[in-house]
Amino acid sequence: MTGEQSCSLDTAGTPEQRLGVLGCTVVPGERRCSALTGGWSDGAGRTWTGPLAVLADHVLGEVANRPQAAGFQPVTTALSLDVLVPPPWPGDRLHARAARTAGEVLRDHVTASVRDPDGRLVAVASAWTADVPAPGTTPLAAGPAVGARPGQGEIGELLTDLTEVGSGPDEAVLELDATGWTNQNGTVHGGVWACVAELAATRLTGSAPHAVNRLQLAFLRPGRGRVRLTATALHRGRTSGLVEVRGRDATGRVCVHAMVGSRADHAAPGAVATLSPAGRNAPPPAR
C-alpha cells in the first residue's frame, strides 16, 4: 500500500485529531505520520511537549497494528520520548516515521523519529507493544484515511478537562475527566497520559526556566473515566530536573508510571539569573 493513507483513526473526534495528528502513510517497512502544531500552545506563549507524545504514540502503535489473531488486540506497554530540540519549532507541523526494530510472538519494539519541515531531527521515540487477549472482540483493521484539518486550541480543550486538586513545593495532584480522551479500545490514550504527566510535572518547576526533554511512561493497566495524577519532585537542579508521576483510576489502582525529565532552558529570558549558585541540588526560586 505504498503511498496510501491508512490508519486506525476515526474520521472525527479522536484525541489524535483533537491534538493535530493527521492520517498515516504506509510505505514498505514503516509508517509515516504528520501533526499540526498550531494547537499545542496554551495561549500564554507556551508550546507544550506532551502533544508530541500523542503523535509518537500513534505512529508507533500503527506499526504494531498489523492483522491480529482472533481474540487479541495490540496495546502499548511502554513509551519513551526524547526531545532533542525544544519547542517552538519552525512551520506548522512535524513529521514522524516509525518502524519495527525487534520483536517476538505477540510482542514488538518499535522506534520513531520526528523532524520539522526543514528536516531537522527534533525528537526520537520508542515503544514496546504487546498483543493481549480481548475475548469477544474482533481484530482491529485499518480505518479510513484521515485528512481533515483539526481545529485549533486543542491543548486548551485538554486543560479545560483538568482539575488541580492540590499542589505544594514537592507534590502536585491533577484530575482528568478522560471520557473524551480515550483510544479505540475505550481507555485513556497513552499520549494523553503523557500530556497530563507533563502538565502535572511543570507545576513543580517553579520559576526556573526548564524545558521538558524526556518522557518515559509504563502503562500498567487501562485507565477509564476520571483519573488522578500525582507528581512528586525528585530533583530540581541548575541543569536538570526529574519528576515522578503516578496515574490512578477511580479505585486508586496505579495505571501509569511516568518519569518527566527536564533540562535548563538557557535560551529563556532570565535563565542565567535563575540558576542557583548554591549548587545542583538547590531548589528553584519560590513562586
Features from the language model and the residues they span:
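Non-catalytic linker/capping segments at the edges of enzyme domains
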Residues: 1-40, 127-180, 273-287
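Hot-dog-fold acyl-thioester-processing enzymes
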Residues: 18, 31-64, 68, 175-202, ...
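Structured N-terminal alpha/beta-domain signature
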Residues: 26, 56, 81, 108-110, ...
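Intrinsic-disorder/low-complexity, polar/charged segments enriched in Ser/Thr/Lys/Arg/Asp/Glu/Gln
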Residues: 30-32, 78, 93-95, 109, ...
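Hydrophobic residues in beta-strands and at strand termini
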Residues: 35-37, 83, 176-178, 219, ...
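Hydrophobic beta-strand-centered segment that forms part of the acyl-chain substrate-binding groove
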Residues: 61-95, 100, 200-228
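HotDog/MaoC-like acyl-thioester-processing domains
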Residues: 62, 87-90, 99-152, 221-226, ...
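Structured core of small recognition/catalytic domains
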Residues: 172-239, 243-256
